[in-house]
Amino acid sequence: KKQVTFADIAAYTHFSKTTISRYFNHPDSLTLENQEKISQALDTLGYKKNKLAKVLANGKSEFIGIIIPNLYLHYYSEMLTQLLSSYSDYHYKFLIFSSEHEAEEEQQYIEELLSYQIEGLIVLSHTLSSKQLSSYQIPIVAIEREAEYVSSVTTDNYMGALQATTLLIRDKCDILIHINVNVEKTVPAYDRIRAFKETCEEYQVPYDIDLSVIGNSYQEILNEIRRIFTRIEEKYPNQKKGIFLANDTYANMFLNLIFQKYRELPSFYEIIGFDNSPIASEAILPITTVGQQIDIIAQTAMELLVQQMEEQKKRSPKPLEKPVHKQITPILIRRNTTS
C-alpha cells in the first residue's frame, strides 16, 4: 500500500502543504476547526507517522542517551527500568551504553550517541569528569555521581548512612563495620562513609571501615566479599556485629555467606544495605536497607533533562546560568536483618 504523503493530505483537505506541515510541527498556529479537519483526513487516508522523515526535517531525533556503569549492581538495573518507564510520560526513546573505567571507550560511546542526534544525555558512570561532559554542549543530567559542571540528582547519602548507623548503635552492636569501595570525596556516595565514621565517633562506639571491595564483575565482587566475611569472622568472634554495606547487592552476597555457614542469620549479626533495589526484598531473608527513592530520582532526572531539551528547541534558547542540583531524601526500610 502506497504511503500517504503531505501532498495527499493537502489534496484531500484542500489546504496547502505548508498548512499540513504546520499541523504536525506547530498545531497551535491553526484554528481548532482546521486541526479537526486535518485529523479526520489522517484517519480516513490511513496516515502513518514517518519518524525518520521528521528527524531529517527538523533535526530532532526524540532520542536520549544513557551511560550506565553496569547491570550486575541491582541499583543500576532498577534505575534503568525506571528511566525507561518514563516513555509513557515524555515519549522519548533511549539509546543505552554500559561503560566502566575506560575513559576513551566512554568518549567513543558519547560520539556514537551524538551521531544519532540525541537530544539529551543521562550519565550514571563515573569515568569522565563533569567538566569533560559539559564540553559536549547538549543537555546533560548526572545521577549519583560527581556533577560540579552539569545538573544532577542525588540521594542525601549522609542522612541515609546516619539512619543506618544509628539503628545499629540502638540495636547494641558491639562493633560496627562499613563495607564499601574507596570512593572519591567528590562523589555523593562518599557521604555514606563520612556519616558512618562521624556517627560512630560521636556515639563513641568501636567501628571498622573496609574500603577494599573492588571488581568489574559479579564474581570478582563476590570473591572480595567472601574474603571480607572471613576476616570479620576471625577478627571479631563472640561480638555482635553490625554490618552496613554500600549497596543491596553487597548486602545480599554477605547475607548468603552467613547462611552458607550458619544456615540462619545468627543473633550476633545485623545487616543493612543501601538502595532498596529489588534484591533487598527478594533475598533469602528480606534485608533492612536505606531506600533510595529510585522512582523519584529517575522522574526528577527526566524532568530536569526535558526542561533543558525543551528550552533548546526555542528560537532564542536561554541555557541554564548554572547547573541545577536536586537531592532526594532516603527512607530507612526495616526488614528481617536487624532487630
Where are these regions (language model features)?
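Hydrophobic alpha-helical segments within soluble ligand-binding/sensing domains
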Residues: 153-178, 194-198, 220-230, 251, ...
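Short beta-strand elements in bilobed, periplasmic/extracellular small-molecule ligand-binding domains
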Residues: 87-98, 197-222
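N-terminal helix-turn-helix/winged-helix DNA-binding helices
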Residues: 1-5, 43-81, 90, 115
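Flexible loop/hinge segments that line or gate small-molecule binding clefts
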Residues: 124-163, 183, 249, 275-287
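Extreme N-terminal segment that seeds HTH/winged-HTH DNA-binding domains in transcriptional regulators
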Residues: 1-15
